[in-house]
Every structure is written in C-alpha cells, then in structure tokens.
A protein has these predicted regions:
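Active-site pocket-lining segment
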Residues: 198-200, 236, 244, 315-384
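Conserved active-site "lid/cap" helical segment
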Residues: 35-99, 103-111, 118, 201-210, ...
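N-terminal extracellular/periplasmic Venus flytrap/periplasmic-binding protein-like
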Residues: 43, 49-50, 62, 67-70, ...
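Condensing-enzyme catalytic core mediating Claisen C-C bond formation in acyl metabolism
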Residues: 35-62, 74, 177, 263-329, ...
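Intrinsic disorder/low-complexity segments
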Residues: 1-35
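Conserved catalytic cysteine-centered active-site region
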Residues: 93-147, 190-194, 261-287, 368-395, ...
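Flexible glycine-/small-residue-enriched beta->alpha junction loops
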Residues: 147-201
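Active-site-proximal alpha-helical scaffold in enzymes
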Residues: 124-154, 197, 203-232, 294-301, ...
Length: 430
C-alpha cells in the first residue's frame, strides 16, 4: 500500500482524510505527520561580528546601520551565497532614534544586497540580536524564506539626546533633555529605574555579595584577555577599517573594552553605582558599547545544495517573562523551557553563553540552575567584552559557534535577559 503521507503532500487534507476513512484519533496523528514532514530544519552556515568598541572609542565614527552593513556583507560572503538569493534581512537594533527609516533595510542595501531583499528591524532590548535569529529560523522552518541574514547592531556612542515636549514649545522654565541610551536602552519603563537597580534587587534576594561579583568580573576579563592572546576571536571577527584624516585607514580587529590589568584590588576601590551601600559598580557591570554581528540561516536541504557545511543546526528556542524588577533572573525559566523542548539535560550541554547583563546576574543564574562554571562564558562575557545592546544576542551566539567548533563539541545554549522582565534562549547542535 502506498504511504498516505507521501500522497498527502499537495492534496487537500479534508478530502484526503474522508477518502482514507480513518477515525478522529488517526486523523489527528495523520495531520501531525503531514505538518511535521513539511517543517524544514534551520541551520546556520556563517557567523561573523565586528570587534566590540568602547563608548566613544574606535567605532564612534560608525552609525549602527554602517556597522550592520559590514557584517551583512561579510556574513553573505562567508556563507558563499549570492546576494540576490537572500530573501530577508532581520537585524536587532535598540536605540533607533535618529537612524532613519528601517535600520535593517539600510544595513541590507549598504551591505551589498539588492533592492529585492526584504528587511525588518527588531527591538527586543538586549535580546534583539538573538530574537532576530530566532525569527529567521522560524521563517526557514515554515518554508516562508529560504536564506536569511539575521543579527544585531548598535552604536551607543551615536545615541542622540532627546528634547521631550519641545514640539509644543516651552513657555517658561528649563527644558529637559533625555539620553536615548538611558531612556530607550537602560531604563525600566515599569519601575522607573535604571537596570542597574534590578541588579541590586538580585543581589539582595539571591544573596550575591560584592566580593562574589568582583571576583566574577575579574575572571571575565581574564578569560577574555586570554582568549584574545590565544587568537580565539580571530576567525569570528571581521576587521573594520577606520578612515583617517591623513594616511591609510586604521585596522581595528580587537575588542576594546577588555582590561588585562583588572584585579580584585582595583575593582574593590570602585563605589556602588546605583544604590548607596550597594554592590553593583562600574567594574562588575558591562560597559555601553558599539558593534554588530550577523549569521546566515537557511535549511539543511539548501545548505546541501550549496555544498556548505553548516556551523550548527538550530534545535530549539524559548522565551520567558517575569516581574520587571526580577528581569536579571528571567533566563532561568527560558533555559528550563528550552531544555524541555529539546529533551536535553544540562549535562548534555557542552557550552553555555549567558549574557553578562551584570556580574550579579551571572552569579545568581549559575547558582540557581546549578550550571557548571567551566561551561559558562569560557572566553569571558559582556562584563569584559562589552554590551552593545542590540548586538549582544547575536554576538554571544557567534562566539559560541566558533568555540564549539574549536573544541569539537556538539551542544550549546545562548541566553539573555532583557529589559521589562523577559528573556530569550536558543539551543544549537553541531
């Protein structure tokens, strides 16, 4: 007898089921088989990032869209696909004020893609870069798209100041300017406080001391510094040429924020940044930074047709939510949901990239999930490498993909918290 599943493709389901005369339970199972058979397996076939720039540092002359264009162009080149074969570009970007219409579209066209390529910009705060890749994977899985460039970009150095209520005019008194970095990137819209204050909440509720945070921050810098010296980031980074008024461009190829000289003593001298007598300081928090990263997502079928070996397949993704003031702990639930979806245990996972929104968050989540510290942020995290908020989600995934390959390891999880009390997480497998 012919396989009814094979017959089903291209046939009206209701007509087919009536023809087969099967009962309701069998119908449900049959429909599930038909649907699942049409789901494609999304894979990542290239990944790249710029070096991370300090605030007002080497990349200050580049708008977010210009940084995005650099990685879009390079991701497509590394994937070995034709620009005209790209269906869509999805880029995360948080501080969009003043960038102009649809920053992702700007990155796409300036990145060498033709006018026929669609583009969409995502704002899911610190999770924007990873959410863009999650959306790309969904499009590939459903067959809506075939090849997608996805990632994130941010230039916090170029964030504007905003003059609220200026449109109506000021009759008397002083006008108040708002810093777009703070207002749109780092300020809780619900509790009316800086995200650093939520770090203090975690410190108190989950009993994470200042000493633990400083030790974690020091180790993040040490791991990142060691990774740079060993050339571990070399393959994932695309060099950026910085134009000069005179002479040849300066080649920028190394993450700027990392400090090899970070010590417990130097960290201990810093004052609390968000609360008198608090524990969160500028030293155990990430900086505000500039950078971009992108991956190319396609189906395993298309990768085979292209003759490209995937870096990894996207196995699952998850989101979660909690009360806004506990935003730092939101990845706990996202990772738990992801493990249920994939059927993995934490013992099955080789590497975990957890965005270091603050050192206190990384310490608390590692403890809460009983993570193996030897698997978490093995080359340092945002406390050392920086946190260009729209980029970070795609940055941690990119770094993890290259480290999985270097170790010949198989499974990895990338996760981030994000303002407002949400989190995103993704599982990949080689």
């Amino acid at each position: 007898m012919d396989d009814p599943l094979a017959t089903a493709r291209g046939t009206d389901t209701s007509v087919l089921l009536d023809t087969l005369k099967i009962n309701s339970n069998a119908k449900s199972s049959f429909i599930e088989r038909v649907v699942m058979s049409s789901i494609k397996q999304p894979v990542i076939i290239s990944a790249v990032r710029t070096p991370v720039g300090k605030f007002l540092g080497a990349l200050k002359g580049f708008k977010a869209t210009e940084l995005g264009a650099i990685v879009v162009r390079e991701a497509v080149k590394r994937a070995g696909v034709k620009p005209e074969d790209v269906d869509e570009v999805i880029m995360g970007c948080v501080i969009q004020a003043g960038l102009g219409q649809n920053p992702a579209r700007q990155a796409a066209l300036h990145g060498g893609l033709p006018n026929t390529v669609s583009a969409v910009t995502v704002n899911k705060v610190c999770g924007s870069g990873l959410k863009a890749i999650m959306m790309a994977a969904q499009g590939i899985a459903l067959g809506d798209t075939d090849i997608v460039v996805a990632g994130g970009m941010e230039s916090m150095s170029n964030a504007p100041y905003l003059l609220a209520k200026a449109r109506e005019g000021y009759r008397l008194g002083h006008g108040k300017m708002l810093d777009a970095i703070i207002q749109d990137g780092l300020w809780c819209a619900f509790d009316d406080q800086h995200m650093g204050c939520t770090g203090e909440v975690v410190s108190e509720r989950f009993h994470v001391s200042r000493a633990e945070q400083d030790e974690y921050a020091m180790n993040s810098h040490r791991k990142a510094s060691a990774a740079i010296k060993a050339g571990k980031f070399k393959d994932e980074i695309v060099t950026v040429e910085i134009p000069q008024k005179k002479g040849a461009p300066v080649v920028f190829d190394t993450d700027e924020p990392v400090r090899e000289d970070t010590s417990i003593e130097s960290l201990g001298k810093l004052k609390p940044a968000f609360k008198e007598g608090g524990t969160v300081t500028a030293g155990n928090a990430p900086g505000v930074n500039d950078g971009a990263s992108a991956v190319v997502v396609t189906s395993d079928e298309r990768a085979k047709a292209l003759g490209v070996e995937p870096m990894a397949r996207i196995v699952g993704q998850a989101t979660s939510g909690t009360e806004p003031q506990l935003v730092m702990m939101a990845p706990v639930e996202a990772i738990k949901k992801l493990l249920l979806k994939t059927g993995w245990s934490l013992n099955d996972v080789d590497l975990i990239e957890l965005n270091e929104a603050f050192a206190v968050q990384a310490v608390a989540i590692t403890r809460e999930l009983d993570l193996d510290p030897e698997k978490v942020n093995v080359n340092g995290g945002a406390v050392a490498l920086g946190h260009a908020i729209g980029q970070s989600g795609s940055r941690i995934l990119t770094t993890m993909l290259y480290e999985l390959k270097r170790r010949d390891a198989h499974r990895g999880i990338a996760a981030l918290c994000l303002g407002g009390g949400n989190a995103v997480a993704m599982a990949v497998e080689r």
